[in-house]
A protein has these predicted regions:
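Alpha-helical bundle regulatory/interaction domains
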Residues: 1-20, 24-27, 33-187
Length: 187
């Protein structure tokens, strides 16, 4: 029963977040939407930011579980952009709220996972030093995160995605060059 209530609270919050800004959602709105009392809400969550944090972390973890391997840069970007597009209004409401730091931290964690998984999948047999791998992950993670943030801060426009596809075409082969440069340095 407790897990059902907790899931109902999360579902109501996400529904409301897709309807109005985070700052306009109250505990009262959530409990009225899912038909519980305030005490039930506070039994499960300290406040709305803790509810938001748990939802964002769970959704990030779920995305990570869904992609045990990633075989192209296009797939890297697709993972980062797919869920945001599905929940565009909610993402914009979180991004434009005072609680966006936790959202950005989990987005950065997702970007790091995606890049690390891509490198492991595509370059599993390439010999790249631990230091170089760390630097490459840092570089590519920040690149992915930066493009994602730019897209969200510009309103998540659909037409921006075609520019992103073109950027990926222009950058095709860059990860391979980075690994090749790492191997040349080691010689």
């Amino acid at each position: 029963m407790a897990n059902f209530t907790k899931q109902a609270i999360k579902a109501s919050f996400i529904k409301l977040l897709n309807q109005k800004p985070l700052s306009k959602i109250s505990v009262r709105d959530i409990v009225e939407d899912c038909g519980i009392n305030r005490n039930s809400f506070y039994y499960h969550f300290q406040d709305i930011p803790s509810l938001l944090g748990e939802i964002v972390t769970e959704q990030t973890d779920e995305l990570i579980r869904q992609y045990p391997t990633i075989s192209s840069m296009e797939e890297c970007f697709s993972v980062a952009f797919h869920t945001a597009r599905e929940n565009r209004r909610a993402v914009m409401h979180i991004f434009n709220s005072a609680n966006r730091d936790m959202f950005l931290q989990d987005t950065m964690r997702l970007c790091e996972y995606v890049v690390d998984t891509y490198l492991t999948t595509v370059f599993s047999d390439a010999s790249i030093s631990g230091d170089d791998r760390r630097v490459v992950v840092q570089f590519m993670k920040c690149q992915l995160f930066g493009v994602w943030i730019d897209w969200v801060s510009s309103g998540m426009k659909e037409e921006s995605l075609s520019d992103l596809q073109r950027m990926l075409q222009l950058c095709r082969g860059v990860p391979e060059l980075i690994v090749a440069h790492s191997n040349n340095r080691q010689l």
